[in-house]
């Protein structure tokens, strides 16, 4: 067991001071948290600096904080921002470590068993270990996570109890230390020295923690006593300094001691006998044979190695949980008084609520056909009410909070003023009769001023027809549809910003990474057709696409005024009035955001010296494509090493596109 440091303070480092209505939002949020309020909503308009406000709140309340985002890309962006704000504190990243994941499944209609197939990202696995170890060692921790944080992880008590604690002067034999390391799933390898491994050279044991990627520790013995412990560069062996205490955390989150393992194996065997009897009674002899063979193999592996592939499916027995009891998750690694912040809560809470059912239906099929014991059903994500039971205090952050958040609390704190003085755009409604020619005139007016236009339609056919028509009219236009790959999508956004074309047509322009300051006009076709993209939240989010330009304007083409349209227009007008009053009072003139146009191709500069080469990938022969993949893979690892996961994901998608050509 390790002692957690509880007196560290968060230290926020920023060249900015809170401005606009940030000071009031920060003060209200902090007062409510310190006053014991369980849930509150930060309703911040696009571009008002919500992440900065969140950072100020974390620094002032000084609580370990879990920030949950609805996808890896957004989690990566937030992680980078929090890292900049808190360079002297533990800012951690916890997302699914699979680059590729095909879950275990069975399709009875075709009698097809799909074995679990996955590719684990070593860098992200390291960061997950770094997150859990930081939570057990200190209190000044921010973990930025995706919804994978509600999936089963392993007992924090077993994880903490298994820590191997070393210090100079400790009486322990070298062989005892080696056994202890093997017990916590470290692997001896005297040649290939990397994370989760150790090597032995006479009286010296070198250990490479699972949460590190560059530094290892050299433990030097004098007889049966530790003489000294030194931190070294894993690659060169260069000594970086001596340490007076070293805590080695397990190399896997699913760890249990020998006594607990024997109890778990006995329970697995008992459950196996029970399930075999059930299958035989039902005449399911094939299922019984399949289950017996698979489970007995896993039991043998657990007995001999303490681990087996798919060990998480036995986590109920290994953790000593009862049937139906929720699994341990990342949330259990936090102390009781931690703070949760849900970013883009209108999206994230929907994911959290929906995870359980999808996982359950897939696993029930595996259990019914003899691929897994029924206890595998308890290796699962948390149900909504189980997640809620972990909540001590929570802040939902969104420009458009969902129904769920509004049901949880009446405390809504608004953040409407942008530091740049930018206003929410003006919104007008025009009839659909003659809408295309009307829109053409508006586009041409924008082109003359070197500004850009977004057009959002409801159907693929309309988007394609509109794009073709505008091209005939001499407009430089592109259509962004769902089939476009990630890298190509980012290139399209870049080209729009550079003025390679002036108009972007799409169906769903709400996805992340689509904010373009040069866009001064957003046209919403079929605005009166109620649905996901034309409800109040969808319309407000779409209107927000024009909120980064001082000339921002939105035109809704519709023949009737729906309630969603009216509410979205009223809310935008309300925010705009508040922003205008603030600007007038403080003499602020709105300024279009000056955002650097990042050279998206530069991520692959060494492999692809110029843009022309990326376009002509099809002309490369098989060997040239193979060489390019090798170079790109090196750059992907480099980007991941620099914690630029968005960049790494873009390069990965390019690699997949090149591989698909063979």
Curated annotation (Swiss-Prot):
First-listed, main subcellular location of the protein, grouped into a coarse class: cytoplasm
CDD domains from the UniProt entry: DEXHc_UvrB, SF2_C_UvrB
Pfam family membership, one: ResIII
Domain spans labelled Helicase C-terminal: 435-601
InterPro entries: Helicase/UvrB_N (IPR006935), Helicase_ATP-bd (IPR014001), Helicase_C-like (IPR001650), P-loop_NTPase (IPR027417), UVR_dom (IPR001943), UVR_dom_sf (IPR036876), UvrB (IPR004807), UvrB_inter (IPR041471)
Function: The UvrABC repair system catalyzes the recognition and processing of DNA lesions. A damage recognition complex composed of 2 UvrA and 2 UvrB subunits scans DNA for abnormalities. Upon binding of the UvrA(2)B(2) complex to a putative damaged site, the DNA wraps around one UvrB monomer. DNA wrap is dependent on ATP binding by UvrB and probably causes local melting of the DNA helix, facilitating insertion of UvrB beta-hairpin between the DNA strands. Then UvrB probes one DNA strand for the presence of a lesion.
Protein name as annotated: UvrABC system protein B
Record organism: Streptococcus gordonii (strain Challis / ATCC 35105 / BCRC 15272 / CH1 / DL1 / V288)
Source taxonomy: Bacteria, Bacillati, Bacillota, Bacilli, Lactobacillales
């Amino acid at each position: 067991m390790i002692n957690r440091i509880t007196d560290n303070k968060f230290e926020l480092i920023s060249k900015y001071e809170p401005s606009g209505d940030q000071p009031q939002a920060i003060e209200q949020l902090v007062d409510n948290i310190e006053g014991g309020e369980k849930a509150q909503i930060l309703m911040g308009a696009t571009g008002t600096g919500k992440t900065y406000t969140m950072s100020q709140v974390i620094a002032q309340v000084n609580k370990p904080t879990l920030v949950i985002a609805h996808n890896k890309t957004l989690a990566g962006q937030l992680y980078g921002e929090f890292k900049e704000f808190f360079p002297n504190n533990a800012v951690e990243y916890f997302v699914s470590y699979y680059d590729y994941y095909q879950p275990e499944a069975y399709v009875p209609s075709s009698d097809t068993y799909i074995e679990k197939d996955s590719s684990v990202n070593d860098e992200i696995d390291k960061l997950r270990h770094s997150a859990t170890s930081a939570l057990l060692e200190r209190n000044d921790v921010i973990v930025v996570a995706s919804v994978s944080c509600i999936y089963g992880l392993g007992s924090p008590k077993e994880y903490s109890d298994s820590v191997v604690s070393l210090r100079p002067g400790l009486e322990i034999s070298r062989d005892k230390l080696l056994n202890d390391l093997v017990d916590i799933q470290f692997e001896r390898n005297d040649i290939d020295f990397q994370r989760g491994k150790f090597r032995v050279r006479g009286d010296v044991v070198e250990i490479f923690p699972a949460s590190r990627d560059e530094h290892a520790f050299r433990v030097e013995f004098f007889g049966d006593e530790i003489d000294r412990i030194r931190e070294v560069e894993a690659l060169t062996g260069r000594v970086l300094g001596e340490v007076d205490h070293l805590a080695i955390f397990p190399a896997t989150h699913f760890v249990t001691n020998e006594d607990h393992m024997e109890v778990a194996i006995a329970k697995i065997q008992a459950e196996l006998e029970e399930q075999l009897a059930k299958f035989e009674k039902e005449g399911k002899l094939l299922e019984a044979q399949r289950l017996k063979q698979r489970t007995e193999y896993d039991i043998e592996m657990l007995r001999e190695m303490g681990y087996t592939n798919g060990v998480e499916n036995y986590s109920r027995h290994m953790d000593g949980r009862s049937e139906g009891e929720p699994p341990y998750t990342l949330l259990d690694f936090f102390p009781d008084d931690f703070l949760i912040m849900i970013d883009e809560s209108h999206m994230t809470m929907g994911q959290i609520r929906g995870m359980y059912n999808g996982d359950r239906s897939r696993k029930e099929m595996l259990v019914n056909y003899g691929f897994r014991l029924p206890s595998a059903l308890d290796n699962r994500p948390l149900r909504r009410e189980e997640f809620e039971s972990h909540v001590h205090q929570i802040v939902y952050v969104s420009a458009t909070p969902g129904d769920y958040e509004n049901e949880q609390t009446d405390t809504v704190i608004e953040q409407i003023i942008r530091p740049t003085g930018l206003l929410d755009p003006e919104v007008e409604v025009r009839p659909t009769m003659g809408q295309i020619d009307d829109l053409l005139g508006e586009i041409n007016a924008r082109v003359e001023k070197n500004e850009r236009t977004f057009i959002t339609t409801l159907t693929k056919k309309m988007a394609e027809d509109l794009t073709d028509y505008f091209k005939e009219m001499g407009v430089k236009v592109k259509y962004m549809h769902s089939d476009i790959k990630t890298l190509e999508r980012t290139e399209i956004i870049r080209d729009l910003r550079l003025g390679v074309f002036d108009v972007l047509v799409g169906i769903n322009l709400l996805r992340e990474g689509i904010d373009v300051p040069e866009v001064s006009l957003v046209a919403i076709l079929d605005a009166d057709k109620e649905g996901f993209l034309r409800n109040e939240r969808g319309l407000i989010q779409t209107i927000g696409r024009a909120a980064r330009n001082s000339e921002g304007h939105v035109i809704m083409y519709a023949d009737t005024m729906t309630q969603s349209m009216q509410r979205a227009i009223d809310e935008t007008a309300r925010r705009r009035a508040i922003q205008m009053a603030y600007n007038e009072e403080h003499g602020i003139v709105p300024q279009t955001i000056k955002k650097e146009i990042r050279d998206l191709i530069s991520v692959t500069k060494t492999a692809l010296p110029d843009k022309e080469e990326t376009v002509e990938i099809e002309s490369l022969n098989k060997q040239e494509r193979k060489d390019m993949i090798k170079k790109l893979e090196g750059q992907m690892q480099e980007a991941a090493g620099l914690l630029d996961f968005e960049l790494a994901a873009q390069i990965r998608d390019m690699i997949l596109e090149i591989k698909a050509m063979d």
